[in-house]
């Protein structure tokens, strides 16, 4: 645990230095076609320790009961839920969310992954010490539910500018970026399209640290847009631990 303790010291220094800086509002956007992850969405939104935030959800499945979803979030005045026909692509749904956003920063989050309490704060702080317009994580933890294994993917791309890729569920960017680029009008690779357009236009991207986010790899590939088996993805990762308590490794 020495490595995480060293990181904790560094990250806490940054938090302390920037604690009195103005924290702009953030519009969290996500799409879902499954109601079974609504509890996870709820828990992530509650957990994230960031004062000025809103959540915009697009239901991209005609069979989902929108009223059921509204009732789930009835205690929030900063959550809005829309329903868009399932024939509309994921990229189009995300671009729709951006148009609805009332804040100047957009955070794309996934419905089934894990986000720690300081996830958004640490990501927003990066804008204070870089000139990047797009922030995210390349190095990131992966939890394999099938095996109870916590692993690390892309460990070499961390705390540096990047022109390659960022994990799709961790994208945080200035809303003004969408004056020049959009998510791709596709169901797979909509974020890759955005990165490519950013590179073409000289929009800088920065990969932050690996902490406070976990990509949850489910046993059933139908639960994922990206159809890759657990064994194949695991072969691309570095195993950290066999554990049912991944939070102790990833939360700072």
Residues of each region from the PLM?
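Glycine-rich, basic loop-to-helix element that forms the pyrophosphate-binding segment
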Residues: 84-101
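Conserved catalytic core of nucleotide-sugar-dependent glycosyltransferases
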Residues: 99, 117-185
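The conserved acidic donor/metal-binding loop of glycosyltransferases
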Residues: 110-114
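Catalytic beta-strand/loop signature of glycosyltransferases that borders the donor
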Residues: 138, 205-213
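Acidic donor-binding loop at a coil-to-helix junction in glycosyltransferase catalytic cores
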Residues: 188-196, 203
């Amino acid at each position: 645990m020495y490595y995480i303790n060293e990181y904790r010291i560094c990250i806490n220094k940054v938090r302390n230095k920037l604690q009195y800086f103005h924290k702009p509002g953030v519009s969290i956007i996500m799409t879902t076609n499954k109601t079974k992850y609504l509890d996870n969405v709820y828990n992530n939104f509650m957990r994230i320790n960031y004062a000025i935030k809103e959540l915009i959800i697009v239901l991209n499945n005609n069979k989902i009961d929108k009223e059921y979803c509204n009732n789930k979030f009835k205690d929030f005045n900063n959550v809005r839920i829309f329903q868009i026909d399932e024939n509309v692509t994921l990229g189009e749904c995300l671009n729709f969310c951006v148009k609805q956003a009332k804040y100047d920063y957009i955070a794309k989050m996934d419905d089934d992954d894990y986000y720690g309490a300081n996830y958004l704060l640490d990501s927003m702080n990066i804008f204070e010490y870089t000139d990047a317009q797009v922030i995210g994580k390349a190095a990131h933890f992966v939890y394999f539910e099938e095996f109870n294994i916590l692993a690390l993917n892309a460990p070499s791309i961390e705390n540096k500018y990047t022109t390659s890729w960022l994990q799709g569920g961790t994208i945080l960017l200035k809303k003004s970026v969408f004056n020049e680029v959009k998510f791709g009008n596709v169901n797979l690779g909509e974020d890759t399209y955005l990165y490519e357009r950013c590179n073409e236009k000289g929009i800088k991207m920065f990969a932050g640290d690996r902490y406070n986010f976990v990509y949850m790899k489910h046993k059933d590939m139908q639960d994922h847009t990206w159809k890759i088996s657990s064994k194949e993805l695991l072969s691309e990762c570095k195993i950290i631990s066999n554990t049912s308590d991944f939070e102790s490794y990833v939360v700072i």
